[in-house]
Each structure stands twice: as C-alpha cells, then as structure tokens.
Amino acid sequence: MKIRPLHDRVIVKRKEAESKSAGGIVLTGSAAGKSTRGTVTAVGNGRILDNGSIKPLDVKVGETVIFNEGYGAKIEKIDNEELLILTESDILAIVEE
C-alpha cells in the first residue's frame, strides 16, 4: 500500500532508538524510549497560504529529521511498518551528515 500525505503533511519512518546510554549502559524495552529521529518517506504538495498559493515544503524525501514527539504525531501501521504523519511544523530540524 502506498500512502500520500496531503498539503503540509509529511510521512516519517521512525529510526530505532539508541540502545546505549551516554555512560555506555545497554538500555532495553521501555528504558530505551522512542527515537525522535526518522527518515522522510513522503511529503505533501505544500502549505496553502492565505492568498491561495501553495508554499512547497522545506523537507524532502530521504532526509533525516528530528521531530517533536508531543505535537500532532499520528501513528499508523502501513504494511507492518510504523509510520508517523506529521505536519512540517512538527519537524524541528533536518540532520545534515
């Protein structure tokens, strides 16, 4: 199944959380928490402005992003993969490696 986000929505596949603490302790289960990083798998056409024009999104497919866990993230299971549906404003940064 293919999913296509609308407007300023972005589909993100969450990356695995770090399994070691800063001190080198191996974390398991809920102690590891959920990552707030992911890879963009699809983007909408853009945000509709007040004048009716469309502003393209700044994020692109394939980019790694850091997102805000608590703001508007919707979790869906598509083909046994957990995907997040976020608005572009839920994304805090693009990771450049």
Swiss-Prot record:
Alphabetized GO MF terms: ATP binding; metal ion binding; protein folding chaperone; protein-folding chaperone binding; unfolded protein binding
Name assigned to this protein: Co-chaperonin GroES
Species this protein is from: Buchnera aphidicola subsp. Geoica urticularia
Family: Belongs to the GroES chaperonin family.
PANTHER family: 10 KDA HEAT SHOCK PROTEIN, CO-CHAPERONIN GROES
Tagged with keyword Chloroplast: no
GO cellular component: cytoplasm
The keyword DNA-binding is annotated on this UniProt entry: no
Subunit structure comment from the entry: Heptamer of 7 subunits arranged in a ring. Interacts with the chaperonin GroEL.
Function: Together with the chaperonin GroEL, plays an essential role in assisting protein folding. The GroEL-GroES system forms a nano-cage that allows encapsulation of the non-native substrate proteins and provides a physical environment optimized to promote and accelerate protein folding. GroES binds to the apical surface of the GroEL ring, thereby capping the opening of the GroEL channel.
GO BP: chaperone cofactor-dependent protein refolding
Main location: cytoplasm
Subcellular location: Cytoplasm
